[in-house]
Amino acid sequence: MVGFGSIVGGIENLATREYRGRTMARHIKRCIYCGADSDDANLTDEHIVAYSLGSDVYLKEASCVACADITKRFEQHVARAIFGHHRIHKGTQTRRPNERPSQLPARILIRGVEYRKELVITDHPYFLAMPIWDQPGLLRGISPSANFDGLCAHLYYHIPDNIKDALELSDGEIAEIRPDTAGDATQFGRAIAKIAYCNAIAHFGLDGFEHLELPDLILGKFPYVSFLVGSVLREPPPPNRDGRYTVS
């Protein structure tokens, strides 16, 4: 969702790199966000894609504790508010497996009355709403803005085959299952920027490309997320069944 190949130093068509299992992509020894080095700060490993989204690829000693606390907040929002139900259904890795619920709520409308029903995971219908907006303002030649032009969402969903029995519907009875998402475009955009930024560092090194305002955007100091993050507003291609995610 990031026009990143065109933004960072004019680099396009980044080579595809495949990782399997827990992998160190690069050893940095400096905070990639604020610049603190190992002499000044306790540095932690930084996942390119959040661990909560299934990633095991990381930059070693790449974030100070203060910056890690900032990135953790928007990554938790993405993992819980946007991908939360999807992660539970798919059994995506978590650092707190004992806290994973055995039931999830569904938002149901029957005969004009809306209510919530707790369902076991195998009976639970869910939605995944991925925010999307227009191409980055930088690529469109417009001034930085806090607006998200064309903001909408790609909506994916799963309805189990036994939904009639799960909702205890009688023959001919119709139920409307409604999305129940609260994704925030700013936090989602910062998470996408962080993935793109870390991926560029993995490929080119910390000093191998022009950062522009990306570190400040990721840390929340540059408020114009849509100036550097965006997408072509079109239907996404079919997912690659051979991998969990693709960064390009």
Regions found by a protein language model. Give the residues of each.
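Extreme N-terminal basic, low-complexity initiation segments
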Residues: 2-6
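Alpha-helical structural context detector biased toward long hydrophobic helices
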Residues: 7, 11-13, 17-29, 38, ...
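Short recognition patches in nucleic-acid-associated and regulatory proteins
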Residues: 39-52
